Amino acid sequence: MIELTKVTKLYGTVIGVNEIDLVLEPGAYGLLGANGSGKTTLINLLTGQLKPSVGAVRIFQSDPWAESNVRYRLGLCPATDILYTNVTAFQFVRFLLELQGINRLDSAELANNALDVVGLDDKDRNRPMGEYSRGMKQRAKLAQAIAHDPELLILDEPFSGLDPVARHEMTTFLQDWVTSGKSVVVSSHILHEVENIAQHYLLMNHGRLLAHGSTTEIRDLLADIPREVTLRCTDAVKLAGVLQYQECVESVGVLDGNLGVIVRSTDANSLFDALPNWITEHELNVTEVESSDESLNWIFDTLLKMHQGEI
């Protein structure tokens, strides 16, 4: 679906993205990184709005910069609110469909269908967009992105500025989109916004792609990084005494109130494999196990620290 080969984009002497090699099959992807990490530049390359300075971009085996036909297979919901204030959402979506060569009658039907899907009722879709709230503007942008039924939907910071209700509605829509078998790339600088949508993640920092894959695949990149595991139990001192002699344990600390221990392990998988036997053998009552790497935030924060030489 997406293939990038040694892609670099320069803005004068400034590097937008740097030597990205990437192959993505159809599916749902979260594009993650801080503001200025290169996410929007990458999206503009994928959608044919920018030409790479070096390397090649292929979407459905075509060059989106040079081959306009492939762009009909894409839907883009941009981050910016560049909307005509005196135009209604219906007029906006219909006009963009007409630009694709769809006749006026069919474009009107497709526009109304898309506006139905995103939840803009008859009254709101026929009001000037200058009167819209941020959430309504996002719905209008989303409607134009899906009206032509694209194979790949790309959204740049779609949750930005939305209230909790609108965020929930956006999440539900994207979950339904993925469930229907269509592909999506969702850009965000906030991890939890895409956790309920994407199965695979791409992490960018300073124009570079630090890692990509499923949560499990990315976690495997950190196999040699010590992790903290919290074990809650009824006798923390006894548990600490057992753990301190194990090869996979680097250190053990007892929680306040003797309610459990914090274990620092260089091989968390071995720790988890052996733990049931230790509990049985020493008659320990462990009530809860919690690992730091259960959080995607921890995984991505750790990758960033590795890239910056802090680990």
Each PLM stretch: what is its role?
Residues 153-157:
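Catalytic Walker B motif of ABC-type/P-loop ATPase nucleotide-binding domains
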Residues 171-263:
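ABC transporter nucleotide-binding domain
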